[in-house]
Design a protein with these regions (language model features):
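Feature marking well-ordered beta-strand scaffolds used for ligand recognition
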Residues: 1-176
Length: 176
């Protein structure tokens, strides 16, 4: 097939998610930003080649991780230089025109997260877009944060679960 080079410097860390036939790529390389690559162009490849990203969003520098909520068309980027490393909200409904629409900084660095449209028994949150984040300040303050991110310009903290002195809140995935 070929390769898509890094946007800046080499880094062993990349995270890639796919949405609407596009790969969304972040890296911890300085100033990498978000690369967007249209995967449909791979259908006609006959010889290996070097590809170029279709779009590069440079608003946030580097990032550790990305999650895409396919139901809402939003990407959530974690560990950037914006919002103290908290989640950054990017509208990717048009994959070739991503737009930063907000973020959340109140609870320090978010290492990873999962975002869902809530469909549980609590009617207050039914149909709302909810972020579950694994947060750490790099020391003893580790927590899981639960944020209503339905309104990107006004995220609202619902709750948190504190994991002080217990290691690192690295990642968490819902089971149902």
């Amino acid at each position: 097939m070929g390769k898509l080079p890094t946007a800046t410097l080499k880094s062993p860390w990349r995270d890639i998610k796919v949405y609407q036939n596009h790969a969304f790529i972040v890296s911890e390389a300085p100033d990498h930003g978000l690369q967007v690559f249209d995967l449909t162009q791979l259908r006609l490849v006959k010889e290996p080649q070097t590809f170029v990203a279709d779009v590069r969003l440079t608003d946030f520098g580097n990032a550790h991780n990305i999650w895409i909520n396919e139901e809402s068309g939003y990407a959530y980027v974690f560990g950037t230089k914006l919002y103290e490393g908290g989640p950054l909200f990017i509208n990717v409904n048009d994959p070739l025109d991503p737009k930063v629409e907000g973020g959340y900084s109140a609870d320090s660095y978010t290492h990873d997260g999962q975002i869902v449209i809530y469909d549980g028994p609590d009617l207050v949150f039914k149909g709302r877009e909810i972020l579950f984040g694994s947060n750490s300040d790099g020391g003893e303050d580790n927590q899981i944060i639960i944020i209503d991110v339905t309104e990107k310009s006004r995220p609202v903290k619902i709750s948190d679960i504190n994991y002080s002195f217990s290691g690192y809140a690295h990642q968490g995935i819902l089971t149902e």
